[in-house]
Amino acid sequence: DIYTTVKTGAALYLIPHTLFSWPIRLLEYLDRNQINTIFWVPSAMILLSKLKALDKMDLNGKLRTILFAGEVMPNKHLNVWRQHIPDAVYANLYGPTEITVDCTYYIVDREFADEEPLPIGRNLPNTDILILNGDDQQAENGEIGELCVRGTSLAKGYYHNPEKTREAFVQNPLNPYYTELIYRTGDLVRTNELGEILYVGRKDFQIKHRGHRIELGEIE
């Protein structure tokens, strides 16, 4: 978030967390400071759509780029945003911390029914996406497999946790010729008829809440 504003010569606003408890004040803050781009977790956007805050203020033409990542974005709530701010560009970004930090993107370019899944799109530059089935082979189109990432953005591993590092950062099973690490995300995905990646779920019992990972086993 910081580097993109530096690169484009934009001003970076750190919105006070308390404003997310007051949706109208939050929108007034965006309007007052002439903010034209936001990069939020879907939870924040869902809150505003549920409380119908977008009915109270017209930001169309002012808010021009709306990016979101960290959780699944339901089209039911995204459609509310698109109805109220139709001129904005919407982009769904995906990527775990281990690949610092986004590896796929989807610019919303068509209409979706409320119950349809929103694609996480295609790989970003310098990143390649592998979808591996249960036999560690490339999944066929439409077949569910684990999303794995290779490229220049991979982390070195987990700090002081070599065992977990060895489990998640592994040799690419599709490359028997030389050392090439990939990161196994644990996320299950498939591709649609357009070649776009769709998120299906998790291999384990990890969930996301407000963009933060939670291991249900650790709570138990």
Model-based region annotation:
Residues 1-2, 25-26, 78-80, 102-106, ...:
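Short aromatic-enriched loop/helix-cap "lid" or pocket-rim segments at secondary-structure transitions
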Residues 3, 7-10, 35-39, 49-119, ...:
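Gly/Ser/Thr-rich phosphate-binding loop
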Residues 16, 41, 69, 104, ...:
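A secondary-structure boundary/capping signal
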Residues 24-27, 55, 220:
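Short hydrophobic/charged patches on amphipathic alpha-helices used for structural packing
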Residues 25, 43, 67, 218:
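Ca2+-coordinating acidic residues in Ca2+-binding motifs
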Residues 43-45, 73, 154:
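Alpha-helix capping/helix-boundary segments
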